[in-house]
């Protein structure tokens, strides 16, 4: 008699409703990033947006993706975009939205100077709250220089 196997049913319909806030543990890095980004002063970034065109993605969302991406080794904007579909922490940070790689890259390029300062602020807060482990990253001019050289045109 042949062995019976349970096969995958790829036509199964899942009717599941999940609140993004319920899928990550309370102490997850993605929650920390969202919390810290919400405390930063982003007025200089908001000031650069006009009234014309469609509604842009919130700077907090795009900055959160960049910060979390850098913290977890995801630097490519194409990988960041893909992660908003495939990775629960990125989906959480993006609030279920999916900015394309060009939008993320344009945001990064247009706000490079502000982002350098904001990244340092995030790192300092992470260090002060104990989220940043000793030896993970140095917080000095090298971080800013690395960020500048990696993303200057």
For each feature predicted by the language model, list its residue ranges.
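Detector for conserved single-position "signature" residues within domains
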Residues: 1-153
